[in-house]
Amino acid sequence: IDATVNLTLRILPDNLLLAGIFIAACFISLSIGTSVGTIVALTPVAVGLAEKTEIALPFMVAVVVGGSFFGDNLSFISDTTIASTKTQECVMRDKFRINSMIVVPAAIIVLGIYIFQGLSITAPTQIQTIEWIKVIPYIIVLGTAVAGMNVMLVLIIGILTSGIIGIATGSFG
């Protein structure tokens, strides 16, 4: 987690941390069709960012949850989208269009608020070295999830990859 947090702190300007996490949650959830899966994947990184900045932990987690719900609401592969379109006998494209008119304006307003809130954020000036090998499990989990792989298989692969890398780098114990 620390490697991914350090990578995020290096890539994103301080004032865009909140907006960046929100956009990432929106995109991931929209791509994989599950808000819960997105929350599970991003919350550890968000917690790490909150610990290294002055961002309140509950607020940072709320940013992840809000973005996750946005994407899940619009995703074509979300279980609720599939169930609702089948039971209501409507076309997914129509549901997407109508939901977009509702949630996209709200997301734009929220994004503006996060950008404004981010103006007061300062990250530590000394960012630890990024251990690139420890970022690999996140890339694999996000990549396989976005590719549409079964959620349980994605989680198993993520756990195994993390375990192997953790043992290889001596990160356990």
PLM ranges: what are they?
Residues I1-A50, G173:
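Membrane-embedded alpha-helical segments and adjacent helix-loop junctions characteristic
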